[in-house]
Curated annotation (Swiss-Prot):
Entry annotated with the keyword Nucleotide-binding: yes
Protein name per the record: Nucleoside diphosphate kinase
Upper taxonomic lineage: Bacteria, Pseudomonadati, Pseudomonadota, Betaproteobacteria, Burkholderiales
Primary gene name: ndk
Family: Belongs to the NDK family.
A GO CC annotation given for this chain: cytoplasm
Organism annotation: Bordetella avium (strain 197N)
First-listed, main subcellular location of the protein, grouped into a coarse class: cytoplasm
UniProt-listed Enzyme Commission number(s): 2.7.4.6
Protein role: Major role in the synthesis of nucleoside triphosphates other than ATP. The ATP gamma phosphate is transferred to the NDP beta phosphate via a ping-pong mechanism, using a phosphorylated active-site intermediate.
GO terms, biological process: CTP biosynthetic process; GTP biosynthetic process; UTP biosynthetic process
Length: 141
């Protein structure tokens, strides 16, 4: 087992539903610690840079439009196997296919408005965490 860090974004749809606390509680109950967090409005340029890996995909414009439609809650989670634990808590990308009790099954409306984003691998986690949080703003506890 290894201590990992992962990026979690509570997306505009879940922020608008006022379920930030319920989602964070699930992370903490699963043994993950929030070691950096903030509520912010993404600029279009930031959303395009963050999701640049999807730039050539047909859904890119809709994804960027959605991510700038309201504030997001970005956080760094730390814990044993944090990346996989977070992905298990989130559930399948499509909430209709997400297991009961997962964040997306409980709080997401569609494959587009799917409540949360989480890093998918250690390499992407490192890049995504650094995108939002300089190391000086991250505090292990």
């Amino acid at each position: 087992m290894s201590i990992q860090r992962t990026l979690s974004i509570i997306k505009p749809d879940a922020v608008a539903k006022n379920v930030i606390g319920q989602i964070v509680a699930r992370f903490e109950q699963a043994g993950l610690k929030v070691i950096a967090a903030r509520l912010q409005q993404l600029s279009r340029a930031d959303a395009e840079r963050f999701y640049a890996v999807h730039k050539e995909r047909p859904f890119f414009k809709d994804l960027v439009d959605f991510m700038v439609s309201g504030p997001v809650f970005v956080q760094v989670l730390e814990g044993e196997n944090a990346i996989q634990v977070n992905r298990d808590l989130m559930g399948a990308t499509d909430p209709k296919k997400a297991a009961p009790g997962t964040i997306r099954a409980d709080f997401a409306d569609s494959i587009d408005a799917n409540a949360v984003h989480g890093s998918d691998a250690p390499e992407t986690a490192a890049v995504e965490v650094a995108f939002f949080f300089p190391e000086i703003n991250i505090h292990s506890r």
